[in-house]
């Protein structure tokens, strides 16, 4: 249960940054090198990440993806069509809202690595992979006191390193308010690093277009209360309500879908435990349950609804199941559309 909780905490957010010398990408998500419109990266490209500068003289060919309780980074690599660069991947979610993605992730090489107690890649195993790029969900993935190879050790071995911008702290704590723009920044930056900036631009444009179309359908409609639940994921608690979404990228997703999270927090709190008494007096129009390796997630959703017959969501049996699209990654548009159809079905008939 502790490992499940750690997975959810790390999945909460991620983005990244880049600045530089020849071709450069800055901390501003909208700033891209001119080469992005040409569909290729002009090397060398220098990137500022978590206060340090990394220079790529060519596209990475031996990429290692650390676990960190995330799936957004490896999903972005798959979406960008550069999965063949991965020599060892430790990320896996077991389900996806995008057809064939979970299977594509499972098919990536793992490097035959025995993970440590944190279910991630220990120092010696990492160095033995001879990577030229290591991607970690947070700064903690390079913490020596956790048994990981440091960014300095990897640089000495010839590997650049990359951490999403908001997660540079050792604990991986999220800074600022995560939004879908963070997912676009991740795609844009990985596209630049891996010589597919044009492909990144197309993915971003497709997502923006899909979200705009969905948002237009629900524009002017009353905002509906959406409860986002991670069943059984609480710290040492198997309750359905011990891990309810508070602050996170998902609030931007819900907003663009014409909904609102009644338990939204802007103080950095990602999950909250809500009592049944409080839930009973909170009007809920749509229930979203997040599936992480559940044997019967539909039964879980129906069990939750049955406890609150007064909810509009219960009266209409109104729930949706999501997996990876609610987190940072390349497919937030999928979550936006599914939640919009959940709480504003009349706008999609």
Language model region names:
Residues 2-14, 18-76, 192-230, 283, ...:
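Bacterial Sec-exported substrate-binding components of ABC uptake systems
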Residues 49-51, 112-122, 266-276:
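Short helix-initiation/N-cap motifs at beta->coil->alpha
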Residues 67-129, 133-134, 138-142, 262:
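A short, structured surface patch at a secondary-structure boundary
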Residues 69-73, 122, 146, 150, ...:
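Stable alpha-helical elements in mature extracytoplasmic
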Residues 94-97, 140-149, 159-189, 221-249, ...:
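Extracytoplasmic ligand-binding site segments that recognize negatively charged/polar headgroups
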Residues 120-133, 148, 152, 273-283:
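Short helices/loops that flank or line small-molecule/ion binding pockets
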Residues 177-186, 266, 278, 282, ...:
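Structured C-terminal subdomain patch of bacterial secreted/periplasmic proteins
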Residues 240-271:
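Alpha-helical, coiled-coil/dimerization segments enriched in small aliphatic residues
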């Amino acid at each position: 249960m502790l490992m499940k909780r750690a997975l959810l905490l790390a999945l909460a957010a991620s983005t990244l940054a880049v600045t530089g010398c020849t071709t450069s990408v800055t901390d501003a998500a909208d700033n891209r090198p001119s080469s992005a419109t040409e569909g290729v990266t002009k090397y060398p490209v220098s990137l500022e990440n978590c206060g340090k500068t990394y220079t790529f003289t060519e596209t990475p060919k031996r990429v290692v993806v650390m676990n960190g309780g995330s799936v957004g980074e490896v999903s972005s690599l798959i979406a960008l069509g550069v999965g063949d660069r991965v020599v060892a991947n430790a990320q896996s979610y077991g389900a996806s809202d995008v057809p064939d993605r979970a299977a594509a992730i499972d098919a990536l090489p793992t490097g035959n690595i025995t993970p440590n107690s944190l279910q991630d890649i220990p120092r010696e195993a990492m160095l033995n992979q001879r990577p030229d790029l290591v991607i970690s969900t947070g700064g903690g993935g390079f913490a020596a006191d956790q048994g990981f190879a440091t960014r300095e050790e990897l640089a000495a071995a010839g590997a650049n390193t990359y951490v999403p911008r908001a997660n540079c702290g050792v604990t991986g704590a999220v800074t600022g308010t995560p939004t879908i723009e963070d997912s676009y920044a991740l795609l844009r930056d990985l596209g630049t690093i891996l010589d597919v900036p044009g492909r990144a631009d197309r993915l971003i444009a497709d997502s923006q277009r899909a979200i705009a179309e969905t948002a237009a359908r629900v524009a002017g409609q009353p905002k509906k209360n959406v409860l986002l639940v991670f069943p059984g994921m609480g710290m040492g608690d198997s309750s359905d309500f011990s891990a309810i979404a508070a602050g996170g990228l998902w609030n931007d997703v819900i907003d663009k879908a014409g909904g609102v999270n009644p338990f939204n927090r802007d103080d950095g709190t990602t999950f909250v435990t809500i009592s049944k008494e409080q839930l009973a007096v909170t009007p809920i129009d749509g229930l979203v349950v997040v599936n992480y390796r559940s044997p019967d997630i539909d039964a879980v959703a129906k069990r939750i609804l049955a406890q609150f017959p007064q909810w509009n969501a219960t009266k209409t049996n109104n729930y949706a199941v999501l997996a990876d699209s609610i987190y940072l990654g390349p497919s937030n548009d999928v979550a936006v559309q599914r939640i919009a159809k959940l709480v504003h079905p009349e706008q999609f008939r």
